[in-house]
A protein has these predicted regions:
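Short, charge/polar-rich alpha-helical segments
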Residues: 7-28, 40
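N-terminal acidic, proline/glycine-rich, low-complexity intrinsically disordered segments
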Residues: 1-5
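Amphipathic alpha-helical coiled-coil segments
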Residues: 57-77
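Amphipathic alpha-helical binding modules
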Residues: 77-107
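Secondary-structure edge/capping motif, primarily at the C-terminal ends of alpha-helices
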Residues: 35-46, 72
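Short amphipathic alpha-helical heptad-repeat segments
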Residues: 23-34, 62
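Short, charged, amphipathic alpha-helical segments
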Residues: 48-59
Length: 107
């Protein structure tokens, strides 16, 4: 009697999360750039329409970065975490997952 195997759906979700987590650095960089453009527009008193567009771009970039950060958390937990809540809770208590959770919540 060994450890239960994750479902095929859990495996698919895990692969998708690993792929998204791999782009986390690029997405964080894009969010930094979007924030910089937004702040520069505010500093130079740009028209409201431009500031709004840049704010929406920043929001989209931060949302993508946050999704990637939470995907990294789920990827660190592993595919069994999608099916087994006890396994997930145990993994959530590890330092690596704590660090990833803190990064995601910081966004």
């Amino acid at each position: 009697m060994g450890r239960p195997k994750p479902s095929s759906e859990a495996e698919q979700q895990y692969r998708a999360d690993v792929e998204l987590a791999g782009r986390r650095g690029d997405l964080l960089g894009a969010a930094r750039e979007a924030e910089s453009r937004f702040r520069q527009a505010q500093d130079r008193n740009a028209p409201d329409a431009e500031v709004r567009r840049l704010a929406e771009d920043l929001d989209a970039a931060l949302t993508a970065a946050m999704r990637a950060a939470y995907a990294a958390q789920r990827a660190e937990i592993g595919p069994l975490g999608y099916d087994d809540r006890i396994f997930r809770r145990k993994k959530m208590a590890t330092p690596a997952v704590h660090a990833l959770t803190a990064q995601a919540e910081h966004l």
